[in-house]
Each structure stands twice: as structure tokens, then as C-alpha cells.
Amino acid sequence: MHRLTLPKSARLLKRKQFVYVQRCGQYCRTDQATLRIVPSRHSNIRKVGVTVSKKFGKAHQRNRFKRIVREAFRHVRPNLPACQVVVSPKGGTLPNFGKLSADLLKHIPEALPLVTSSK
């Protein structure tokens, strides 16, 4: 059984990392969020970053969205291919944890072949 953790090494932390994924990533929309996905150069690295603008809501709503996304990514991380993902909210409603986890598992593997073939 995998130990489900999300260490700092599994998160996008620097602006440069976010900009790279935003510019080079494959764009994928779900009901609850927008994903930007880039294949990772190393086979065992899976990273997530979350961006939420102030238009989404007050600080507690933005923080809640970030927590839900990180938790969903933490649960599906062992089953994902090597990639870097930036997640942004869609609309002003908080996502459903189960649906977001399923969306991550479905859309990330679908988008990765598109990214590698377009380069």
C-alpha cells in the first residue's frame, strides 16, 4: 500500500514552474476546474500547483478549494503518469472531492499523449 503524502517535492512552488506549465501545458476543462498538464522529464515526478484568483471568493473559500485539490491529487498521485499539473477553479462553487479525484484520474492520462504528440 502506498503511503499517501504530498511533500513539498510534489508541489509546484516557484513562479517559474507555474509559468512553464501555463505556457507549455495541454489545456483541459472539467466541470469543476481547469487543468494545465505537462509531461514530466523524470519518470517518477508528479507535481501539482493550484492557482485561485480573488474573483473566486473570500480567502476561506480560496483556501478550501486549494485543500480539496491537494487532497484529491494526494489520493490519485500513485495512479498518475509522470506529469506537472496546474489546477484553477471554474466558476464560483467549491468542487466535490470525489468528482475532482475522478476527473484528475480521467483527464490527465488523456491529455498527456496530446502534449507529447504536439511537440
Curated annotation (Swiss-Prot):
Recorded catalytic activity of this chain's protein: Endonucleolytic cleavage of RNA, removing 5'-extranucleotides from tRNA precursor
Domain of life: Bacteria
GO biological-process terms attached to the record: tRNA 5'-leader removal
Keyword ATP-binding in annotation: no
One Pfam family named in its UniProt record: Ribonuclease_P
GO (cellular component) term, any one: ribonuclease P complex
Transmembrane segment boundaries: none
Keyword Membrane attached: no
Keywords carried by this UniProt record: Endonuclease, Hydrolase, Nuclease, RNA-binding, tRNA processing
The EC number(s) this enzyme carries: 3.1.26.5
Function according to Swiss-Prot or TrEMBL: RNaseP catalyzes the removal of the 5'-leader sequence from pre-tRNA to produce the mature 5'-terminus. It can also cleave other RNA substrates such as 4.5S RNA. The protein component plays an auxiliary but essential role in vivo by binding to the 5'-leader sequence and broadening the substrate specificity of the ribozyme.
Subunit structure as annotated in this protein's UniProt entry: Consists of a catalytic RNA component (M1 or rnpB) and a protein subunit.
NCBIfam families: rnpA
Family: Belongs to the RnpA family.
Protein name: Ribonuclease P protein component
Species assigned in the record: Chlamydia muridarum (strain MoPn / Nigg)
Origin organism lineage: Bacteria, Pseudomonadati, Chlamydiota, Chlamydiia, Chlamydiales
Gene coding for it: rnpA
